[in-house]
A protein has these predicted regions:
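Soluble catalytic regions of membrane-associated enzymes that act on cell-envelope
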Residues: 194-224
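Membrane-embedded alpha-helical bundles of multi-pass enzymes
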Residues: 2-197
Length: 224
């Protein structure tokens, strides 16, 4: 029975990663990030060990980055692409392990802060970090994007994770806290959009050309 439950948790964790991927361009369905992270937080309910939480985090991250980063394989080949996806997924181990602790202690409000702390580390270390996959990048077109002028992508990520945690808690307990975490960030984003004069006012087409990268392989970055 325990193996079946673990298998179910792993399946949901993988699905949560795919859901978060759907929020990024070119698909750009911003609610998918909220749904995906809510599914991931539900994987940790009612409580799991730190080891299981770490495993769930890795599966979530691996499914996300395998879908998000195939374009890298076009430049450096499939092996480096998979290696990068695995490396980035290692950071999600911390998300899952910490999330398991917070779920067990019912410190649900702290999960968004913990997630963004790990996201910051991944985006800055090592070698300047790798910021692809920040949860904020998937909120283009949604109300939470209007929070960016007040706190940058970190605030947008916190707001997204707050909504996700709130959605998960609406299916668990405490439902009142869940409703607050879900509604307040969306309301603030909506208010910020009104204060800034609404949505899009036009479109701009931009083209860029990168020259002198004629071949595949990791040495492409050495060319000038």
């Amino acid at each position: 029975m325990r193996k079946r439950i673990l298998a179910l948790r792993l399946g949901v964790a993988a699905l949560s990663g795919v859901s978060v991927y759907l929020s990024y361009a070119p698909i750009g369905w911003w609610p998918a990030a909220i749904v995906g992270m809510a599914l991931f937080y539900l994987c940790l309910a009612p409580q799991v060990s730190v080891r299981v939480g770490a495993l769930l985090g890795f599966v979530h991250g691996l499914s996300l980055y395998l879908f998000l980063l195939p374009w890298i394989g076009e430049f450096v080949g499939n092996l480096p692409y998979v290696a990068l996806a695995v490396t980035e997924a290692l950071y999600s181990i911390a998300v899952g392990a910490g999330g398991a602790v917070l779920m067990k202690r019912r410190m649900h409000w702290a999960f968004p802060l913990w997630f963004v702390s790990v996201e910051w580390l991944r985006s800055t270390w090592p070698f300047g970090g790798f910021a692809w996959g920040r949860i904020a990048w998937g909120q283009v077109g949604g109300p939470l994007q209007y929070l960016a002028p007040y706190g940058g992508p970190a605030l947008v990520s916190v707001a997204t994770l707050a909504c996700a945690t709130g959605l998960a808690l609406c299916l668990l307990r405490p439902r009142l806290l869940g409703a607050v975490l879900l509604v307040v960030p969306l309301a603030l984003g909506g208010a910020a959009s009104i204060s800034r004069g609404g949505g899009e006012v036009g479109q701009v087409t931009v083209a860029a050309i990168q020259g002198n990268v004629p071949r595949l392989g990791l040495d492409f970055n050495e060319q000038r």
